[in-house]
Amino acid sequence: MTAVAVIGAGAGGAAAVTELTLAGHEVRWWNRSPATIEPFRAAGGVRYEGVFGDGFAAPARFATELPDALDGADLAMVCLPSLAHEAVAGALIAAGVTCAVVLNPGHTGGALHVAEIFRTAGAPPPPLVELSTLTYIARKPSPDAVRITGVASRLRAACLPGGEMGLELLRTLYPAAAPEGDVLATSLANVNLVLHTPGALLSASWVEATGGEGFHEDRGGKRAAPRKATMHAATISFRPDSETPSPRGPQRALR
């Protein structure tokens, strides 16, 4: 059993809490915004559906403060997009993190970016590991639930020098993580950088025709905003959950 501090209460964090809890690991859960994690805390865990079936996963601990989540943790997993990494790195510095930190997902230069934040603050960087993309396709159908429609069957993982033990520990949690020689390989394999833009363009007419209410659950997407849509990691091999119907039913063709 591994003690894992999951940071982030969006769809990715909720999916990680679900899988790691079901696998028997000790999961501590923390989020920067109390409002986002509160529905899960009030419910005592995560209602999940999709590739892991339907059920309820209760983490070992909901942490109100980051040091509480990190206390005794073997690994801290940051399940947040890159725009949050700087703030999370600052919180990890303030909390005095010493365990390995995994960026799930990383971004282009993600581990290098986080290491530089630590050095600039005069703090030694912890062992840093990054993944080339998020390990899940997931969305939150409600504030206290997650729908997981895919799990990566292979993705790239790498660490900065000194993070080798963290990388090996990560691979015990996610055997699909294929180790690379350095973080340049994972950074340059950031498929989201390439895929989100064409996904938004190809979905533009659908999103505009629905007034910003278009969904694409079959791709694990999120509620679309006008003229914007998100498409996740189509070039990664996933275990699709073909049995999960769209809650909105069949979508009509848009002309």
Task: Spell out what each predicted region is.
Residues 114-214, 250:
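Rossmann-fold dinucleotide-binding core
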Residues 1-51:
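NAD(P)+-binding Rossmann beta1-loop-alpha1 motif at the extreme N-terminus of oxidoreductases
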Residues 223-229:
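Long, compositionally biased stretches enriched for glycine and/or charged residues
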Residues 233, 241, 247-248, 253-255:
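Small-residue-rich helix-loop
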Residues 77, 82-144:
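Rossmann-like NAD(P)(H) cofactor-binding subdomain of soluble oxidoreductases
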Residues 53-72, 180:
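Short acidic low-complexity segments
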Residues 24, 59-60, 73, 98:
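Short, well-ordered alpha-helix to beta-strand connector turns
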